[in-house]
UniProtKB/Swiss-Prot annotation:
Name of the protein in its database record: Bis(5'-nucleosyl)-tetraphosphatase, symmetrical
EC code(s) of this entry: 3.6.1.41
Organism: Haemophilus influenzae (strain 86-028NP)
Function: Hydrolyzes diadenosine 5',5'''-P1,P4-tetraphosphate to yield ADP.
UniProt keywords, alphabetically: Hydrolase
Length: 275
């Protein structure tokens, strides 16, 4: 049995299949973890959703910002962006079933046995493990069982940009969603920055990657995440695994085998910017 993690798919189905073939992935024995953003901008988002869903307990994803945006468009809250290339999902006979399944995916996975945390973007520099898990569960409960339409409709805001345990209601839930699905750089006072998406060497000096802000949690448990394609080939601290290597931006898809930490990569098989 082997455990694999793969970076953001974003509709890049063919590259995923090539990687799974290379490692001889066997869903009856192995497990595949995905760091979120299964959809958007690649040409096979529908295939990605169907495939991951079809794996059942042999796969586990977390919600990314593009996944949440797909739910928002499914609810009619946002319009479909042509560049996201998700029309096939909306025309699919299993559309409702796929959105229902996606809505029931977590924001955070903590595997005690294998000793890892998996998120899409990151974990707030102000959270310990207990807070991170409780915050994730709080929003997941609403997405899966509560008034998720109201939450999705009101999640599009960059405020508040700083965590406080006193946050309540939508403000609290927006921060939780943004930390788990959108965070990259932070200010030294731990405020989230949403503007800078550049490689580290081009970032303003007042900004620091979230994983360099000294949260003890970052050293206690290995963290696997995606979201930040411009981190490709950038060093990260020990135990912090950045797996989004920009396949949909004509770079490559990255897979990590957990047991021996071996990396497998697959270059983009097509120029997605040509579509």
């Amino acid at each position: 049995m082997a455990t694999y993690f793969v970076g953001d798919l974003q509709g890049c189905y063919d590259e995923l299949q090539l990687l799974l073939e290379r490692v001889n992935f066997n869903p009856t024995q192995d497990k595949l973890y995905l760091v979120g953003d299964l959809v958007a901008r690649g040409d096979k988002s529908l295939e990605c959703l169907r495939f991951v869903k079809s794996l059942g307990d042999s796969a586990q994803t977390v919600l990314g910002n593009h996944d949440l945006h797909l739910i928002a468009t499914a609810l009619g809250i946002k319009k479909v962006k042509p560049r996201d290339r998700v029309d096939a999902i909306f025309n699919a006979p299993d559309f409702d079933e796929l959105i229902h399944w996606l809505r029931h995916q977590p924001l955070l996975v903590h595997n005690k046995k294998l000793n890892f945390l998996m998120v899409h973007a990151g974990i707030s520099p102000d959270w310990n493990l207990e807070t991170a898990k409780s915050c994730a569960a709080e929003v997941e409960q609403i997405l899966q069982n509560g008034d998720f339409h109201y939450l999705i409709e009101n999640m599009y805001s960059e405020q508040p940009d700083r965590w406080s345990p006193d946050l309540q209601g939508l403000a609290r839930h927006r921060y939780i969603i943004n930390a788990f699905t959108r965070m990259r750089f932070c200010y030294l006072d731990h405020r989230l920055d949403f503007a800078c998406k550049s490689p580290l060497k081009y970032a303003p000096t007042e900004l620091t990657p979230w994983f360099n802000l000294g949260n003890p949690l970052y050293k206690q448990i290995p963290i696997v995440f995606g979201h930040w394609a411009s981190l490709v080939d950038e060093p990260t601290p020990k135990g912090v695994y950045a797996l989004d290597t920009g396949c949909v931006w004509n770079n490559r898809m990255t897979m990590l085998r957990w047991e021996d930490k071996q990396i497998f990569t697959q270059s983009a098989v097509k120029n997605y910017s040509d579509f």
